[in-house]
């Protein structure tokens, strides 16, 4: 019997491409949702080009975030550490890449050692 005359009841389901109806999330949106899952409601930060999409996603997904604008990344990491110690909540500092990231090292090391 030729394959083109097979009854339709024996026909296989069309192959799935793995797509679903779920919306496709951007990396910044996934990051903000992860912050939510960790209970983060306050972010200390110094905006920059590399993290501007995260700031946009924070405003779009969770506009109730309390953002504390810091003037220097090192001060922001110390502020996040102090916030965590004083409240028992997650202390979060958001910095841009390059010098912004390296400026956080002292504060991160201090938090790690405590």
Tell what function each PLM region has.
Residues 109-114:
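Hydrophobic or amphipathic alpha-helical targeting/insertion segments
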